Amino acid sequence: MDDNKRPLYLPFAGPAILEAPLINKGSAFSEEERIFFNLEGLVPYAIETIEEQASRAYDQFRSFNNDLDKHIYLRNIQDTNETLFYRLVQNNISEMMPIIYTPTVGLACERFSKNYRRNRGLFISYPNKDRIDDILNNSTRQKVKIIVVTDGERILGLGDQGIGGMGIPIGKLSLYTSCGGISPAYTLPITLDVGTDNPQLLEDPMYMGWRHPRIGGEEYAEFIEAFMQAVHVRWPDTLIQFEDFAQKNAMPILERYKDRYCCFNDDIQGTAAVAVGSLLAACKAAGTELNQQRIAFLGAGSAGCGIAEAIVAQMVSEGISDEQARTQVCMVDRWGLLLDNMPNLLPFQQKLAQKCTNIQNWSNFSDNISLLDVVNNTKPTVLIGVSGVPGLFTEEIIRAMHSHCARPIIFPLSNPTSRVEATPKDILHWTSGQALVATGSPFEPVVVDGETYEIAQCNNSFIFPGIGLGVLASGARHVSDAMLMASSRALAECSPLAIDGSGPLLPKLEDIHAVSKHIAFAVGKVAVEQGLTLPMSDEILQQSIEGNFWSPEYRRYKRTSF
């Protein structure tokens, strides 16, 4: 119990307290609190500390035989006692993060309606489009500072999950709190239910969402606009994170709102920021600079192109021209290398397409220029996979890359693990342990020739909690590109491999609080420099970060009335 903070004054008592997850303490209510709040007999006699509760909960957690059951168990604790939930996760962050988020959350999304137990967050359905403000008013959280919102159309690599996508905002906000210290009282997960095009869901009698094909076009755009306006009117200072929107909507929504409201898209910008931060760390470990790299991408969707644009921006900041930087980045998708004469390039792909004149001197390539063709002709030093298709980083491709690059940087980032382009074990064996590897999903350490290699997880959780904390602490009105670039550089500064020459490429999850605070300071400092918030000194910003950092400790309660 944190006795250094002032007590909270509660206007209600009895069973209602035990049903409020933000204030419930369960068996940790003191004798005085049990008397004053009419709780005697409603909980067992013994008065326990939060650590004793967490120990019991951990034993129960370990008793489950599969990850989905563990996920459901943790969600049940979260829905009954949030402070205990976050203490449990904090104590076991490396073990539990894959359970509360990727990869287990994907299965939880697929089975959302079948496993539904208790409400959390808000479902805003298209038939209720004229009552959005009323729905926002129904939220159990009224001091909302961070919203994660999805429409469920592109959940991880699993496609359209309808309202089952709610598992993603819930899981993401759990990481905002457990990694970034954002009080759960300030977070709100939202799912925009605009129908589903998943026939299995439409035919499933247990599906709980709006049984209707997805809306699109002007109807969809007007619904998103109504939602954004309603949120801004009710909570004008709230940070909105867009999550798992389909490629056709993700970039247009971001472009439409990023300069109007405080918002960002984690799939595009967060993924890009953590990838660039990891690349900066890998380059430092390899004794080189990012602007010297030749980079090949497999996957040219919004996430891949977002990473590529962030890399180009960082290269330019290191002293080369935008035009030169773009010649060093090759994007390969299902149709082969993106070229400027292709007729069906998406708007966000056009600036990343290679000029046909740049490949005139290439040799031995097919009509649709493959990744292997790119590797053989450009001799890349960096290979990034965001294709969502397993096994595409073949032994031939990796060995060809290693033949011209002593320490290749290889990031198979697709989620979940079943969709990774190549496993770290294969990559390290094919390169005799010389590759610098980071993945999008968690992998066990790999042993090559008696040496153990820890696999860095290029996980957005290293970035977005720090961005959120920095925005809240600084009061930034927008999330600028410069703030995102600052988050990448701050992450690279925390790399054990870059700092000491040994250890993993990215910090351990056990150090995530320090990493998030470091990123928050970098993000907040840029917000101040860009005039996106009120002027403040570095000292005041640091104090604000510490003051906004919530810890899972019980507070003392006092009763306001009888």
Curated annotation (Swiss-Prot):
Binding site for a divalent metal cation: E243, D244, D267
Enzyme class per UniProt: oxidoreductase
Assigned protein family: Belongs to the malic enzymes family.
Catalytic activity, EC: 1.1.1.38
Annotated site, Important for activity, chain positions: D267
Keyword Oxidoreductase: yes
One GO BP: malate metabolic process
Gene Ontology CC: cytosol
Assembly with partners or alone: Homotetramer.
Any coiled-coil regions, as ranges: none
This protein's name: NAD-dependent malic enzyme
Cofactor binding mode and count: Divalent metal cations. Prefers magnesium or manganese.
Sorted UniProt keywords: Metal-binding, NAD, Oxidoreductase
Any one Gene Ontology molecular-function term assigned to this protein's record: malate dehydrogenase (decarboxylating) (NAD+) activity
Reactions it catalyzes: (S)-malate + NAD(+) = pyruvate + CO2 + NADH; oxaloacetate + H(+) = pyruvate + CO2
Active site: Y101, K172
Cited NCBIfam families: PRK13529.1
Needed cofactors: Mg(2+); Mn(2+)
Binding site for NAD(+): R154, D267, N415
PROSITE patterns: MALIC_ENZYMES
UniProt signal peptide: none
One Pfam family, short name: Malic_M
Gene: maeA
